Amino acid sequence: MGKEGVTIRSARQEDLEAIVEIYNEAILKTVATFDTEPKTCDEQTVWFATHDAKNPLLVAELTGIVVGWASLSKWSDRCAYSDTAELSLYVRGDHQGKGIGRRLIEAVLDEGKKNGLHTILARITEGNDGSLHLHQSVGFTHIGTMREVGKKFGRRLDVHLLQKLYPTH
């Protein structure tokens, strides 16, 4: 098990329903994502399949229940971006603030580094201060703010762009 009974592991196909449920909670209740309509497992199957060793998808499991997930996804299909990924992190609302997000980020970043990534980017919506501080505490640097690029719940929202570089050997 891990600290506090939470296990961090690679996602399996049978985790997809829980992953989608957690993401849909964020869609409906937060500005953490700019998706506005809930997703289905069928819709997310292609996304799930894009993850591999270089672009991992990890879950946090507590007493057999998936309570959070983190992924590194290709930033772009253009070849020059092959060593760049975007970090996504979602934890069930009733499990936030318990260190699960930190454990997921640290684990997914370790996997990305081990598998040859150089640059990790994260987009964090204004007002999501907990996520902003969490990312900065694990080495992300704020590199810019995209002003009013999204609209959700009737508000125009800024998005902060953060970056973490792995040293080149």
Map each language-model feature to its residues.
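Conserved GNAT acetyl-CoA-binding A-motif
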Residues: G112-I124
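Conserved catalytic-core motifs of GNAT/GCN5-like acyltransferases
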Residues: S71-K74, L121-I124, Q136, T141-D158
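A structural signal for short, well-ordered beta-strand segments
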Residues: L87, I120-A122, L162
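Conserved acetyl-CoA-binding loop-helix of GNAT-fold acetyltransferases
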Residues: G97-D110, H133-S137
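Conserved GNAT-fold acetyl-CoA-binding loop/helix
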Residues: L16, V20-W47
